[in-house]
From Swiss-Prot:
Pfam families hit by this protein: Anticodon_3 (PF19303), tRNA-synt_1g (PF09334)
Binding site for ATP: T349
Full protein name: Methionine--tRNA ligase
Gene Ontology MF term list: ATP binding; metal ion binding; methionine-tRNA ligase activity
The record's free-text note on cofactor binding: Binds 1 zinc ion per subunit.
Name of the gene this protein is made from: metG
Taxonomic lineage of the native organism: Bacteria, Pseudomonadati, Pseudomonadota, Alphaproteobacteria, Rhodobacterales
GO BP: methionyl-tRNA aminoacylation
Superkingdom per UniProt: Bacteria
Catalysis performed (reactions): tRNA(Met) + L-methionine + ATP = L-methionyl-tRNA(Met) + AMP + diphosphate
Source organism of this protein record: Paracoccus denitrificans (strain Pd 1222)
HAMAP family tied to this protein: Met_tRNA_synth_type1
Record function comment: Is required not only for elongation of protein synthesis but also for the initiation of all mRNA translation through initiator tRNA(fMet) aminoacylation.
Length: 572
């Protein structure tokens, strides 16, 4: 049994996430985790809420709540929405946990011990009207690289360029909007990434199987311009992980906290520990996933994220791991995604533009969204969500192909043989050809899933569904029944077994529909079809079943138009 560690980029706590966030990290990570579990691998699937930094402080202030209260409430909101979308995390943690405090302070202490921390006096933006230093994300302005007028002081979300606040044109306070700013001296800790550049570059060069999107971004930040720069890892904030050197005070750093992008990736490790704590397991239970000297040498670690997160996961977090000098597990494969756009523009949490996860679930079940998002995942380039395309894909793929097959075969069997799988007949050339075609397609599906090629996997799965419809149309058991009831019984028996097969193969994409199909077939048999012929005999003659409710209702033109109108503006 292979062991797979999977992490999804952890979402900011500042509100409910939109569909672009979902398809860029959590959803494809869940797809992969479900697939690997279905193939009998040992999987640890981790995510969390990212609760520190400017977004949390600003959102709590806007909500009029203490930040700790706000974060606790929003964690539960995000966790519930994740459950409703079928995201099968083994643990959904919190970056504000005690585990993350201890681990973050531990890593900082080790980095300092190994000479990779520098204390730097820098000049930072201070808002006179707000009476405080403004961390990067508290400052907005125009990006000097692309001209986007809502760029933040750490990164432009439009062109993804990493920025310093002083780079912005016409900067203003994100708290008050004041332009009454000045630059003052303050002291901070810097991670000496430049000293680790050669080791990081060699590590990236060794990853010859990574997606081009991932490696191109990593190499850009590693080599372009002045190359990899040292990065500040502390901030003048009240909320966050206090700066300590392991478990000891850090002189001169009193009142400061670690930068959110230093502690957030460490939460992957901390969340694994949180999960073990919750289950009452010893430390060895989580360390076997993360420590090469304690059992993690046989773990394959895959990360999922949007392309804007790639620099932090290919440079800064590996610098932390490598610089610690300890045998922590480095990522083996980073699956990164481009952007999902919305009706000609960008999805945006900060701007409230697009369809958000709670809104999506209020109008349609999760599987509708899961299927469209994964089958249109922005892998090789940006993808665009339009209501027309959403309607067409759902109606054609889910209703006309899969749903239609399940409905036709179960209803026909009930009408001619009752609600038990009929006996009689034996396979002929048509069935043998179907088994061969299914075997070829399923092996291709496995290959695409093994390599985390999401869109190709979806296309192959749909082709597998189509084979069932084509067989049913060609075999026409409703006609065969008139002259050869035994042969019709065999055709129906094969068709009903196909439903179980489809449920198993489809579960990573549409888990709720898969559960419904298995429930209708009155089986808990989720065995993977390594042998397709055997899989099509899993449910024997005499096995009872029920005709399920409609798996997928079609989206009407009226509903499409209503939703398009409802979500054309910004979220209030």
């Amino acid at each position: 049994m292979a062991r797979h560690l999977i992490t999804s980029a952890i979402p900011y706590i500042n509100g409910i996430k939109h569909l672009g966030n979902l398809v860029g990290s959590q959803l494809p990570a869940d797809l992969y985790a479900r697939y690997l579990r279905g193939r009998d691998n040992e999987v640890m699937f981790i995510c969390a809420t990212d609760e520190h930094g400017t977004p949390a402080e600003l959102a709590a202030a806007k909500a009029g709540k203490p930040i700790a209260v706000y974060c606790a409430e929003m964690h539960e909101v995000q966790a519930e929405i994740a459950r409703n979308f079928g995201l099968s995390f083994d643990h959904f943690g919190r970056s504000s946990s005690e585990r993350n405090h201890v681990l973050t302070q531990h890593f900082a202490g080790k980095l300092d011990e190994n000479g990779y921390i520098a204390e730097v006096e820098e000049r930072q933006v201070y808002s006179i009207d707000d009476g405080r230093f403004l961390p990067d994300r508290y400052i907005e302005g125009t990006c000097p690289n692309c001209g986007y007028d809502k760029a933040r002081g750490d990164q432009c979300e439009n062109c993804t360029k990493q920025l310093d606040p002083t780079d912005l044109i016409e900067p203003r306070s994100a708290i008050s909007g004041s332009t009454n700013l000045e630059v003052r001296a303050t002291k901070h800790l810097y991670l000496r990434q430049r000293s680790l550049k050669d080791r990081i570059a060699a590590w990236i060069d060794s990853k010859t199987d990574w997606p081009i999107l991932t490696t191109s971004i990593a190499r850009k930040w590693l080599n372009d311009g002045d190359g990899l720069q040292d990065r500040g890892i502390t901030r003048d904030l009240d909320w966050g992980i206090p700066v300590k050197k392991g478990d000891k005070p850090w002189p001169g750093m009193e009142g400061k906290v670690f930068y959110v992008w230093f502690d957030a990736p460490i939460e992957y490790i901390a969340a694994t520990a949180e999960g073990a704590d919750k289950r009452g397991e010893p430390d060895s239970a989580w360390r076997r996933w993360w420590r090469l000297d304690e059992g993690a040498e046989d773990v394959t670690y895959t990360q999922f994220m949007g392309k804007d997160n790639v620099p932090f996961h290919t440079l800064s977090f590996p610098a932390t791991i490598i610089g610690s000098g300890e045998p922590w597990k480095l990522v083996d494969y980073i699956k990164s995604f481009n952007y999902l756009t919305y009706d000609g523009g960008q999805f945006s949490t900060s701007q409230g533009r697009g369809v958000f996860m709670d809104q999506a679930l209020s109008i349609l079940p999760a599987d509708y969204w899961r299927w469209w998002l994964l089958s249109h995942a922005p892998e090789s380039g940006d993808s665009e969500f339009t209501w027309d395309n959403f309607q067409q894909s759902v109606n054609k793929d889910l209703a006309d192909v899969l749903g239609n097959f399940v409905s036709r075969i179960t209803k026909f069997c009930r009408s001619k043989f009752g609600e038990t799988i009929p006996q009689g007949g034996s396979y002929g050339p048509e069935e043998e050809a179907l088994i061969q075609a299914l075997t070829t397609r399923i092996r291709a599906y496995e290959g695409f899933m093994d390599h985390v090629e999401v869109r190709k996997s979806a296309a192959e799965l749909r082709a597998i569904w189509v084979l069932g419809n084509e067989y049913l149309q060609s075999a026409a058991p409703w006609s065969t029944f008139k002259t050869d009831p035994d042969k019709a019984a065999m055709q129906v028996r094969l068709g009903l077994n196909l439903i179980r097969l489809y449920a198993v193969l489809s579960a990573p994409f549409i888990p709720f529909a898969a559960d419904a199909m298995l429930a209708a077939m009155q089986t808990e048999n989720r065995d993977w079809p390594d042998d397709v012929r055997a899989a099509l005999e899993a449910l024997p003659a005499g096995h009872a079943f029920t005709v399920p409710e409609v798996l997928f209702a079609k989206i009407s033109d009226e509903s499409r138009d209503e939703w398009q109108d409802r979500f054309k503006g910004i979220r209030g």
